[in-house]
Each structure stands twice: as C-alpha cells, then as structure tokens.
Design a protein with these regions (language model features):
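C-terminal beta-signal and adjacent terminal beta-strands/loops
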Residues: 623, 775-784, 810-869
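Periplasmic N-terminal accessory/gating domains of Gram-negative outer-membrane beta-barrel systems
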Residues: 100-101, 108, 138-144, 150-201, ...
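Short, acidic, small-residue-rich periplasmic hinge/interaction motif at the N-terminus
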Residues: 60-62, 66-67, 119-164
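Periplasmic-side early beta-strands and strand-to-turn transitions of outer-membrane beta-barrels
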Residues: 258, 266-267, 275, 287-386, ...
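Gram-negative outer-membrane beta-barrel transporters
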Residues: 464, 526, 530, 665-667, ...
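Membrane-embedded beta-barrel scaffold of Gram-negative outer-membrane proteins
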Residues: 137, 398-406, 412-428, 608, ...
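Structural signature of Gram-negative outer-membrane beta-barrels, strongest in the C-terminal barrel
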Residues: 334-338, 342, 456-458, 462-464, ...
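Outer-membrane beta-barrel translocator/receptor signature
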Residues: 207-209, 221-223, 232-241, 246-315, ...
Length: 869
C-alpha cells in the first residue's frame, strides 16, 4: 500500500492536469493572437477600389489584385452571383462585406493574407433546408455512411450543439435524455434500452447486452464503471435502439451507443471552457486543432478536468460520499498525403484518469424497513449510512487507428484497429465499529482489449454495402480481498486482539470473438430500397474463479507473523499459524471453457414516396453469447456448467419524414420483440444458484422524434417513447413448491412512457436561452416487481413518475460566450432506483438489511465562460 498522504497524491495529480491544460491554452491563445492580428490587419488597412458590377469570381479576383489577400471558396459558391459597384476607399473587411452582402455569402480569415468565402442563408432562404442540403448528419453506427433520414434503425442523435442546449456534461447523463433508454447515477454500466439492462435481466451471464463504442473502440466495463465520461470535444453521440448484432456483433443484442470525438482540421481553431456550479462542480477544458503539413497532416489536442464534491454526505461524519474527479486527454492525427491521395488515416489516443467515491446519489439506510426506526429515515436528507466507505481510482488508455484507401470511385478499403487497457484499484473501508469486525475490502484488476476489423465498402450503380471481418480478444483479471478483525466473531479467545481474517477471490476471464459479416443495399429504382445483412459470430470464453481461504494445517505451518491472523476459526490451532488453500479449484487446473457460433440475419424494405418521406419494415435477430459459470452451494460443493446464448427477434416498421418545406423533421419507429432463451439466475433444489436459459419475454413499443424550426430565432424538439414488457416465463427458484415463476411481471426499469422536450431561442443580437425537460412514467426497479402488498408496509420498489427540467441563458460575443444554467429546476426528488428487498430461495420476501436509494442531484445553479477562435 502507498504510504503517501492521499491529499498529497491528489495535489500531485491536479498539478499534472493543470500542466496539460496550460499547454493546450498556450497553443490555443498563441493561435488566437495570430488570427486576431490577421483580423486587425484586415480592419485597419485601407485600399482604394474601383470594381464595376461584375460576376462574383471576377470581382474577387480584382479584390485580390488590389489587397494581396487571397480569397478561397468552394465550387458552386460563386455560381452566377454578381456583385454591387464598389468605388472608394475601404478596409479589406468593409470591401468584402459590401461585395458579398447581397450575394448570400460571408468571409472569414483562415490564415495570413487569406480569407474563405462561405455560403450563408439569405433572409428569404429556409435555414433548415439549406443546412440539410449542405451537410446531412451521418450515422456512424450503421458503418454504411447513411444519413439520419436514410437509416431504418431507431436512432437518438446528439450533436455538440444539443449537449450545450440540454446543459449536459457527462456521457451517461446525455444517454438518459434518449426516450426508451436510461442510465442510473451516470454510470453507463447501468444503461437500459427498451427494458433490457446492459448486464442482462438479473445480471446473469458473462457478456453484455449493450455495447459502448468510443471512437470505434468497444469500451470495457472497467472503463465505464463509476460514471464520469466527459463530453468535452465530442462531436456526435448516437443511441441506437434495437439489436445491432448483424453489423456490430457481440454485446449489442439490445442496442449500442456510438461516440465520435471531433476530427482534426486543416484550419486553426480552438476552444476553452471554465465552469463552476453548486456542490463543488468545476470544469477546466481546452482544445486546439490545426495543420502540421498544410492539407496533408493535421492534429487535434484536447484536455478536460472536471470535479464535484457530490451531493450525498456520510451520516457518520458529514464528509462527502459521492465525490468524483475526472481528467481526460485526447490526441488525434489525420494523415492525407498528396503523394497518395487515395489514403486517409486517423490515429487517436485517449487517456482517462478518474477518482470516484460511492455511486453518484447512492443513499444507504441505517436500518432495514422492518425496523420501527426506519420510519424516521428520509433518503431526501441525502445522508448515507453504508457498511463500507468506497473509493476507487480508474485509469484507461485507449488507442484507435482508422485507415481508409480508395481503390476506385466505387470501392473503398478500411481497417479499424483498437486497443484499450482499463485498470482499477479501490478500497471499501469499514464505517462500523462492530459488525463481524469488518475492516473492509480491497479490489483491483484490469481489462485489456484488442480488436481488428477489415471491411470493403462499395457503391456501384444500384448496389452499395460492406463486407467485413472482425476479431476481438479480451483478458480480464479481477481480485477482491476481504479483510476482517476476527475478535468479534471468532467462537474462541483470540490473541492478539487485532488478529485479522483475510479472504481473496481472484477471477480470470479470457474472451475471443471472430466474425464475418456483410450488409447490402439494393435500389432498383428511386422508390424502393432493399437491405440484407448476415453475420456469423463465433465466441469463446475461458473462466476461472479461485477463492483463497484459510485452512488449518499445524504440521505444515507456512506463516508466522505476530499480530496477523490469516487462517482458520478452529480453536485448536495456535495463532497466528496458518496456511492458505484454494476453495473452488486448483490454480493449476485448466480454465472452464465454452464456445458458441451463431448466424445473425437482418432485412429491411423501404419505400421512398419522394425525397422527403420514406416508409420501411424490417426484421432482425440479435444475440448475447453464452458461456461457463462456477457456482458454490451452501455446503461448499462446487458446480461447473455452461449456458447457451440468448436471442432477441425483432420486427420494426416506421417512417422518416421531412415536412413543411424542410422546417419539420418527424420520424417514427414501432417495434415488437421476442426475448428468447433469457439467461437468468435460478436457485435449484441442490442449493446452487446456476445460470440457465429459463426466461421468455415479449416487448413492444414506439419511438417518435420531431425537430421543428419555428423561425429564424426559435426551434423546438419533442421525442416520445412508449414501451410495454411482459415476462412470459421466468423460473426464479426451484426450491419453492411449486417452483416460483415470475410470468406476468414487467422487466425492471421499463417505464411505459418517456418524453423529452426542448426549445431554444437565439436572438440576432447575441442573447440566447433554452430549456429542456425529461419525463419518465412510473416503473419497477427490477423484475421481482415488489410492491406494498409484497413488503407488508407502505414501501414499494415501484418508483413514481418524474420530470427533470433544465434551463440556460446567456450572451454570445464574437469569441466568448457567457452562460448561466440551472439543472433540476423543479427540484425533482423521486429516486432513480431503489432496492428494499429480495426473494429468498423459498420464494419468500426477504427485507434488505441496508436498503439503498439512487437519488437525483437537487436543483443546482452554475455558470460557464466559453472561448473559441
């Protein structure tokens, strides 16, 4: 253990963060100073012009001849536009303004003695239509380069602009704004899409149901745990609802989240942010991008430091419970060499350092609900009484490479390789003076992941699509070491009195996945398109769990450390003599293994009524891999077995529409799914809790999304999610008579209605304001569906409806933006999640010894200053 003072270590880490932040700011402001100098030159130098009314291209050539300032513009910008007569003495900026004003064009400096002319909507133009024609948003998750209005998947899309509008700074918080999706305590390991949790119905299984991709790399659970995923310098976030198994493969039976950070640019630009809010919330961020070799090599560098004291205090001493510190730095290089103009390569590097306490908003009650004193406990007091005080450090390194080569105008080759190393080291320290003498536990481990994907992307006449091969390899090591004082629970006198009992449980998991997949789109004419996809996915698991526990062997004594007890509760053993032996299996025995191969088809047919309206139907098969498990009975018997994959068969229909001459986008998707061979935990008659394919569930629903440009200054959006889930078969325990079946229950965290709504106002004079609301109807916390009748009290695990309202207002200068914001304006206090009780092996209700609640952060005010150049 490190003997340094934790405060000293934190200060040392803070200094590292600030040094990198200062470096980014230094580059940023040096480039800003250069650009300001260019702008000052354009503003102060005067020239005499004599330009007659003429075509735009000729007028700009005369402007260059007079000033020496080069003018850049894209093809089609000049068109048939003509300029006004310009005769007199003006600065370069004034002259350009007069030449371009009536042509719907504007200019901005991009380098020394260089400006770029770009298209801007004229007063009579529809700004929404112009924007959609110039730059249609591409959905990266489909891997086919399709625009949002051309995909048949149900996608909730967030841009950097929407992050600002909704006042969100964390990735998990943003995902919660998607309908039919939720995240607890901003921890993406808790993500739920259409009623399916990331770790399965009741956390059974060894794989996940929802994958998170960050710049093309699948994020491991260790990299996501505890929350704290920065949105700074993120360009786009996609929440894809419904199975993505055919194209994305493993861990995407329920959907996926695709995150893309901003790309390097050949023009110098940058940004910085200073933010402060209640509950000790602070953010210091910077980003800069520019050319290394003009039009051939560009870079982007960003850094973000965020911290919060949290909003839950420990009931024992009032100290912060759910604190969080986050530092992330990201670098990108874009290579597009002139000597090989068909090649484009992107290399990305990201390092994240997080320190977190208890789960955000976690409140533990001091007593069970059966205790009369529980009625005096109010979770909204935001005081927690946990058995153990938690603190964890997470460190994640992520490297990705994306290399594309155009063989021809029809065929493109692409290779995507990723590497991730996610490490963690934490401690649960005891908050109790006497409860089995528990001191706490230490836990540490890592997950190392490698992926490689090669695909051929083609577009030839009426055909387009991809053919790809994928390889994945992951190694995970995790160890939990529990440490307790033996004095209070040993059935015999112990000397010395501080003797320690230790239990270590290491777990090793190795995963390999290989796949071949293809996705084709055929468009026989302008009205019809047919999508066909197929994937063969092969996955293997190796698993070993070894529990090292004390065993007595006085004649083979291996340890003799005064004052330390690692050994038996046998009163005939002379302390501190002991040995350590494995409980579950010998460390030298082979790992428990299993392997599965599945075919995953999908198909869709779309009818394009016109350029603005498309109808579609689709069907697909998703899966989550099976694997091995090791279980222990109450009598310490060991069971080693395997379970099969689970499947989600989905049928969807919907439309994608642009209405009111481009001012309204209205999309809809209806779905019906059959969740088959669910992996669930079953308590069998022998006392083993095994994993079995013993569940079946039906679910259906609807997702609507709309975005309406009311005027030049006002826009609104509204999204609706509807969801119904019904468990058809779920054997919970075989020990009861008859076996307890949860048929008829709802899946946990499946509100029937979810709504998001927002409006944004931006006046031409710099003032702006906006508000967003997020509504969820009531739902059960888990599949047990325990209510007041089950608990025999006024308590229930069905959470009530809730609405979160955020608002912001500010003023935008040329380079600076000042924003004031408030989150949870209505001070909503309905918990995000709750755990009060469970079911025993017999099926009887068991009240939790320490009920816990995941509370929402109360109303909080904050302000930020953003700088761009």
């Amino acid at each position: 253990m490190n003997s340094e003072n934790p405060n000293t270590l934190k200060q040392s880490k803070d200094h590292r963060y600030l040094k990198l932040l200062y470096l980014c700011l230094l580059v940023l402001f040096s480039r800003a100073e250069s650009i300001w100098a260019q702008e000052q030159m354009l503003s102060n130098s005067e020239y005499t012009f004599s330009i007659a009314r003429s075509p735009m291209i000729e007028a700009l050539q005369q402007f260059t001849a007079t000033t020496g300032i080069q003018v850049l513009f894209e093809d089609g910008v000049s068109g048939k536009r003509e300029t006004v007569v310009l005769d007199g003495t003006y600065t370069a900026e004034q002259a350009l303004g007069l030449l371009l004003a009536d042509a719907g064009l504007s200019a901005e400096p991009v380098a020394s003695q260089t400006v770029r002319v770009t298209l801007t909507p004229r007063p009579g133009d529809d700004p929404f239509r112009v924007a959609s024609e110039i730059e249609e948003i591409i959905v990266f998750g489909t891997k086919q380069g399709l625009g949002l209005q051309r995909v048949t998947d149900s996608v909730e899309l967030f841009t950097a602009e929407r992050f600002e509008q909704e006042v969100v700074f964390d990735l998990g918080e943003a995902v919660t704004r998607a309908v039919n999706a939720s995240v607890i305590r901003n921890d993406l390991n808790t993500i739920n899409i259409r009623g399916l949790d990331r770790f399965g119905t009741d956390s059974a299984g060894v794989s996940q149901a929802i994958n998170i991709f960050i710049d093309g790399a699948p994020a491991s659970s260790n990299a996501l745990e505890g929350g704290g995923q920065s949105l700074w310098d993120i360009g786009q976030l996609e929440v894809l609802r419904g199975s993505q198994s055919t194209v994305q493969g493993r861990n995407s039976i329920a959907g996926s989240v695709v995150v893309q950070s901003k790309r390097p640019d050949y023009d110098w630009s940058g940004a910085a942010r200073l933010r402060a809010g209640e509950y000790g919330s602070r953010q210091y961020s910077a980003a800069v991008t520019g050319p290394i070799v003009d039009e051939q090599l560009a870079f982007r560098l960003s850094t973000d430091y965020q911290e919060t004291d949290g909003f839950v205090d420990l009931g024992f001493d009032g100290s912060s419970s759910d604190f969080r510190d986050l530092w992330v730095t990201r670098g990108k290089l874009l290579l597009e060499p002139e000597a090989l103009d068909a090649l484009s390569a992107m290399l990305s590097f990201e390092y994240t350092d997080r320190s977190v306490g208890a789960a955000e908003g976690a409140v533990n009650a001091p007593t069970p609900i059966s205790d009369p004193s529980f009625s005096d406990f109010d979770p909204n007091d935001l005081e927690s009484f946990p058995n153990l005080i938690r603190s964890v450090d997470y460190n994640t390194t992520r490297i990705t490479s994306d290399v594309a080569y155009d063989l021809s105008s029809e065929i493109n080759l692409r290779f995507v390789g990723t590497y991730e190393d996610a490490e963690y080291d934490g401690v649960n320290g005891s908050s109790l003076t006497s409860s089995f003498g528990q001191l706490g536990s230490f836990f540490f481990g890592f997950t190392e992941t490698l992926t490689a994907e090669f695909r051929v992307e083609f577009e030839y006449e009426k055909w387009s699509g991809i053919v790809g091969a994928y390889w994945f390899e992951s190694q995970q090591d995790a160890t939990v070491e529990a440490v307790s004082l033996i004095t209070d629970f040993a059935p015999f006198p112990v000397t010395p009195i501080d003797s320690i009992f230790s239990l270590a449980v290491p777990r090793e998991t190795d995963v390999e996945n290989a796949a071949f997949y293809t996705q084709w789109r055929y468009e026989p004419n302008q009205h019809w398109s047919i999508d066909l996809g197929l994937r063969y996915d092969d996955e293997s698991y190796d698993l070993r769990t070894v529990a090292e526990v004390p065993r007595t062997a006085p004649d083979e004594c291996l340890t003799n450390i005064p004052g330390v007890f690692v050994g038996s509760e046998d009163p005939f053993v002379s302390l501190p003599c002991s040995t350590v032996a494995p409980l579950f299996s010998n460390p030298d025995t082979p790992l428990q293994s299993d392997e599965f191969g599945v075919w995953l088809p999908r198909a869709a047919v779309s009818y394009h009524l016109n350029d603005d309206l498309t109808f579609f139907v689709s069907a697909r098969r998703g899966y989550r891999a099976g694997g091995p498990f090791i279980a222990r009975s109450d009598e310490l018997e060991v069971l080693v077995d395997t379970f099969d994959p689970e499947f989600l068969i989905s049928y969807e229909a919907g439309w994608r529409g642009i209405w009111l001459e481009g001012r309204l986008v209205l999309n809809g998707t209806a779905f019906y799914s059959e969740y088959e061979d669910q992996q669930v935990r079953v308590q069998d008659a022998r006392g083993f809790e095994r994993i079995d394919n013993a569940g079946e569930t039906s679910l259906y629903g609807l997702e609507l999304s709309s975005d309406y440009k009311v005027s030049e200054t006002l826009s609104i959006y509204a999204n609706l999610g509807y969801l119904e889930t019904s468990v058809d078969d779920f054997i919970f325990t075989e020990e009861s008579d008859p076996p307890l079946n949860l048929a008829g229950n709802e899946l946990g965290r499946s509100p029937s209605t979810s709504i998001t709504f927002g409006l944004n106002y931006a006046a031409g004079n710099g003032y702006f304001a906006g508000a967003s609301a997020n509504y969820r109807s009531s739902f059960y916390a888990d599949i047990l569906n325990l209510d007041e009748d089950d608990l025999g009290s006024g308590f229930s695990e069905r959470l009530g409806s809730s609405i979160m309202l955020n608002a912001r207002a500010g003023y935008r200068f040329d380079r600076f933006t000042i924003t004031a914001y408030v989150t949870n304006l209505l001070d909503e206090d309905e918990p995000e999640n709750v755990s009060l009780a469970g079911l025993a092996d017999s099926g009887a209700v068991e009240v939790a010894t320490r009920p816990f609640f995941n509370m929402r952060q109360p109303r909080a005010f904050g302000a930020s200053i953003d700088f761009v150049f």
